[in-house]
């Protein structure tokens, strides 16, 4: 029988005991050092009054948002998007069954709640019609006929990672919708998916600027020469930060992004808070005419509605100049729209939400006889079928979403878009994190999200008794008022009588 080497075992225990003692001593020393640092520093009162343990306050504050999201928040409590909304998009993007059981968890009595009016004789499946395409820019040399009523809103390469842009581009092509470049310029990754593209011109004019930073006609022609580029959008303001230019932190300005934008790498990319060369409504119409003349393609603008007297002035000026001078479309962004980075003071308090601004703009265009000439695009937290159907009822011709498609890519609402450490690889340029986002897989999810959203918007339309979603009108929906009773949207937003239509006017 072999006798155990007790000497080796004893030595091992001695080493282990010594290691534990040294480790304990180092921990005590570290606590003493932290204690001294805390009581001598003057910047933070908690650490000075409660040395050492005061650090736990910051730790718990940081992880608290994750506990709230995963353990404590109810399905319809979170902001900006609750779990019910996110889950619908996740399942739609994965092409999974999106039915639920037992009953709705949505409260139907709070003021502002939207209710659709079902028809006693809903549209039969065999009577349903395909969503009709709509032509934008009938006065242009190259008008654009858009098939999908739901499309990808502006998100720039820079704010988004390379694989995210690749997935969106390929998915949009499969889903039959357009993708907006955002204000960061046209990247090769926007083009490689072969989707229809809306090129956005921001206040810094990235991608179409000359050496002095001004709009270049030659650069416009270069961009317009790509057959995938169908329209141009002048970004006047953004929902999350009206009056503030785009912000891309220097950590996200790589050499490639800097080259596309024409700026130094590694430095913060901060756009002017408005277009320096657009000082009036006349300047805006002149800029639209200039870009349309140079490119031959539809041109519109994106804006958050706040001071709304200018809308009547704009329409009056358009009618004075003639319908050809009008923007081919207007994108209405909501005050609760998304962003990669914005001051909280603007994000929380500036501008009107789309539920107020969209009917206002639609009515203003109708009043001036321009609703058929100028197509309306709604944007801002419209990520589910009900929200899209509401926008169609109120007067939108198209709906665009950014964060809805981010959820389709796998976004978990970590709220780290501005920190370059997005855990899903969508808004980071960290290669290690980007590898989690496989463009070919996520492109399928983008396409499935488009397919399933359009399908369920159709389900709502058929329940309302119309053959396709574009036939939805204000009388098909109601809104709960303060007294708990619902009011028809046709009563709440009484549409103005339209003067003579300009739809019959053709390019001469």
Q: Predicted regions span which residues?
A:
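Glycine-rich tight-turn/loop motif centered on a GG-T
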Residues: 199, 205-207, 250-278, 340-355, ...
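Mobile "lid/hinge" segments at catalytic clefts and subdomain interfaces of large enzymes
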Residues: 226-261, 413-432, 457
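Glycine-rich phosphate/ribose-binding loops and adjacent secondary-structure elements
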Residues: 270-434
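Phosphate/diphosphate-binding loops
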Residues: 209-236, 353, 362-363, 374, ...
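Conserved, well-structured core domains of diverse proteins
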Residues: 2-150, 154-178, 184-194, 199-240, ...
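Active-site or pore-adjacent capping/gating segments
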Residues: 411-474
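Flexible, glycine/charged-enriched surface loops at secondary-structure junctions
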Residues: 182-184, 297-302, 327, 371, ...
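Carboxylate/His-rich catalytic cores and anion/metal-binding grooves
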Residues: 176, 226-249, 308, 313-328, ...
């Amino acid at each position: 029988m072999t006798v155990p080497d007790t000497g080796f075992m004893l030595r091992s225990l001695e080493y282990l005991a010594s290691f534990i003692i040294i480790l304990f001593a180092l921990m005590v020393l570290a606590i003493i050092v932290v204690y001294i640092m805390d009581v001598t520093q003057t910047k933070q009162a908690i650490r000075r009054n409660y040395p050492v343990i005061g650090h736990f306050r910051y730790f718990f504050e940081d992880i608290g948002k994750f506990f709230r999201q995963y353990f404590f928040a109810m399905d319809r409590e979170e902001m900006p998007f609750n779990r019910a909304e996110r889950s619908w998009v996740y399942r739609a993007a994965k092409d999974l069954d999106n039915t639920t059981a037992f009953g709705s968890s949505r409260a139907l009595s709070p003021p502002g709640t939207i209710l659709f009016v079902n028809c006693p004789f809903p549209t039969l499946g065999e009577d349903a019609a395909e969503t009709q395409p709509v032509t934008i820019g009938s006065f242009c040399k190259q008008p654009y006929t858009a098939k999908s009523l739901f499309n990808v809103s502006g998100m720039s390469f820079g704010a988004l990672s390379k694989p995210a842009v690749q997935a969106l581009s390929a998915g949009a092509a499969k889903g039959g919708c357009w993708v907006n470049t955002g204000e960061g310029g046209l990247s090769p990754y926007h083009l490689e998916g072969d989707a229809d593209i809306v090129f956005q011109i921001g206040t810094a004019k990235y991608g179409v600027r000359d050496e002095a930073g001004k709009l270049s006609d030659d650069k416009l022609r270069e961009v317009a020469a790509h057959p995938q580029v169908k329209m141009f959008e002048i970004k006047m303001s953004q929902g999350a930060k009206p009056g503030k230019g785009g912000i891309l932190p220097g950590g996200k300005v790589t050499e490639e992004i800097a080259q596309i934008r024409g700026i130094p790498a590694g430095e913060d990319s901060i756009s002017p808070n408005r277009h320096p060369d657009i000082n009036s409504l006349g300047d805006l119409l002149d800029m639209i005419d200039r870009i349309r003349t140079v490119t031959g393609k539809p041109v519109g603008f994106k804006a958050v509605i706040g001071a709304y007297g200018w809308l009547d002035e704009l329409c009056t000026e358009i009618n004075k100049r003639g319908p050809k001078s009008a923007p081919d479309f207007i994108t209405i962004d909501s005050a609760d729209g998304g962003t990669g980075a914005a001051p909280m003071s603007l994000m929380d308090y500036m501008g009107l939400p789309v539920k107020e601004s969209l009917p206002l703009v639609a009515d203003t265009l109708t009043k001036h006889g321009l609703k058929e000439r100028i197509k309306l695009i709604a944007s801002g937290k419209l990520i589910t079928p009900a929200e899209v159907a509401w926008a169609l009822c109120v007067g939108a011709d198209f709906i665009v979403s950014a964060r809805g498609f981010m959820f389709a890519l796998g976004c978990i609402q970590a709220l780290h878009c501005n920190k370059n450490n997005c855990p899903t690889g969508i808004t980071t340029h960290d290669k290690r994190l980007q590898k989690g986002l496989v463009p070919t897989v996520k492109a399928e999810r983008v396409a499935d999200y488009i397919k399933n959203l359009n399908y369920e918007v159709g389900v709502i339309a058929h329940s309302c008794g119309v053959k396709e979603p574009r036939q939805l009108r204000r009388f098909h929906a109601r809104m709960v008022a303060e007294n708990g009773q619902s009011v028809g949207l046709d009563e709440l937003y009484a549409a103005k009588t339209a003067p003579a239509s300009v739809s019959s006017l053709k390019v001469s």
